[in-house]
Amino acid sequence: MNTQDVIDIFKQADAILEGHFILTSGRHSATYMQKAKVFMHADLTEKLCRGLAEKIKESIAEPIDYVVGPAIGGLIPSYETSRHLGVPSLWVERVNGVFELRRFEIKKGARVVIVEDIVTTGLSIRETVEALAAAGAEVLASACILDRSGGKVDVGVPLIALAEYEIASYASDALPADLSVLPAIKPGSRNI
């Protein structure tokens, strides 16, 4: 599966939105990839996550003990990707604003891959790496369905992206004129 295949799946699900959006990262964009519209279709989600699992297998020679997803956005893709990898799926969730591996215990040295939905700045992955390190895990890599940075983001561990698709995003004080006149919508899940 390549980038165009991923974009085609998002188009099939009517999941590429145009307007003025405040992303989960806090950055602004004229394009929003509404993965919830994709993830509501099990067949489309299965295709994407099977493709991601194949890329993970090609990239990581070591055995993987767990796939871990950051809640909320990483729950569905981490679960479905773990199914294709044949390993358990766990998740981290925010407690007082900080990710924790709250509902699970893992052995020290457990080899994990973080799976996220869409990466813009990589903050959720970096925070997940910190939570897993605190739990004693070895993070082999992270992976995502779509890297909006076009391969430029640094998450602190290797990032395996099913698709790299650079979509412009802006700091709130650096909006282009055409975007600044549109009302902003915040569809993300960071504060949930």
Curated annotation (Swiss-Prot):
Cofactor requirement: Mg(2+)
Record flagged with keyword Ribosomal protein: no
Keywords annotated in UniProt: Glycosyltransferase, Magnesium, Pyrimidine biosynthesis, Transferase
Binding, 5-phospho-alpha-D-ribose 1-diphosphate: 116-124
Binding-site list for orotate: 120, 148
GO molecular function: magnesium ion binding; orotate phosphoribosyltransferase activity
Parts forming coiled coils: none
Pfam families associated with the record: Pribosyltran
Enzyme class: transferase
Keyword Glycosyltransferase: yes
Pathway the protein acts in: Pyrimidine metabolism; UMP biosynthesis via de novo pathway; UMP from orotate: step 1/2
InterPro entries registered for this protein in UniProt: OPRT (IPR023031), Orotate_PRibTrfase_bac (IPR006273), PRibTrfase_dom (IPR000836), PRTase-like (IPR029057)
Disulfide partners: none
Listed EC numbers: 2.4.2.10
Catalyzed reactions: orotidine 5'-phosphate + diphosphate = orotate + 5-phospho-alpha-D-ribose 1-diphosphate
GO biological process: 'de novo' UMP biosynthetic process; pyrimidine nucleobase biosynthetic process
Gene3D superfamilies reported in the protein's UniProt record: 3.40.50.2020
Subunit structure: Homodimer.
Family to which the UniProt record says this protein belongs: Belongs to the purine/pyrimidine phosphoribosyltransferase family. PyrE subfamily.
Its job: Catalyzes the transfer of a ribosyl phosphate group from 5-phosphoribose 1-diphosphate to orotate, leading to the formation of orotidine monophosphate (OMP).
Protein name in UniProt: Orotate phosphoribosyltransferase
Organism: Bartonella tribocorum (strain CIP 105476 / IBS 506)
